[in-house]
């Protein structure tokens, strides 16, 4: 069997940015069209070439395909998002590191400081939101293309992945338990698979895009 090459730095950066957006805000009408577009289908096909990601991608593809059969899909996805990520009852999956006892308090602020980044004043959520971790990983993968800071950025990438993996599995389990339709449950499973893959829990080497 021919082994598929690992994801390129730029591909990681783009997929992290995409996932950050989906976990940060509700899917609007334009976002729903994009989810069902050929562009996203091509992206998922690219990810699916990696054996470690294939099952998670296939599940998400099924959930995206099912959106066309779901009446008022955009409104129902918005309701799913609100119920999972904005509520505080026991049937939610809050996307904040501080909600999980495994996470060291304030870790994301230290990571952002090391990266020379800060949270935009327009960002109204707490700084430990999942989307901030994913935006940081996106930035770090783009920065890995610059050879003069590759070693430092790669070390920071590993620290960010390790920090995220302290609580991401529990977040994913909460999505699985409480997302009755399953779109965000599938999305969280894909995210966890990608983070594990990036962290080297699967056979992975960072390569530059040709």
Swiss-Prot record:
It comes from the Bacteria. GO terms for biological process: protein complex oligomerization; protein folding. SUPFAM superfamilies: TorD-like (SSF89155). The keyword Cell division does not apply. The keyword ATP-binding does not apply. Coiled coil: none annotated. Keywords: Chaperone, Cytoplasm. It holds the Pfam family Nitrate_red_del. It is found in: Cytoplasm. Its main location: cytoplasm. Gene3D superfamilies: 1.20.120.1820, HscB, C-terminal domain (1.20.1280.20). InterPro entries: Chaperone_TorD (IPR023069), DMSO/NO3_reduct_chaperone (IPR020945), HscB_C_sf (IPR036386), TorD-like_sf (IPR036411), TorD/DmsD_chaperones (IPR050289). One of its GO terms (cellular component) is cytoplasm. Involved in the biogenesis of TorA. Acts on TorA before the insertion of the molybdenum cofactor and, as a result, probably favors a conformation of the apoenzyme that is competent for acquiring the cofactor. Belongs to the TorD/DmsD family. TorD subfamily. This is Chaperone protein TorD. It comes from Salmonella agona (strain SL483). The lineage of its organism: Bacteria, Pseudomonadati, Pseudomonadota, Gammaproteobacteria, Enterobacterales.
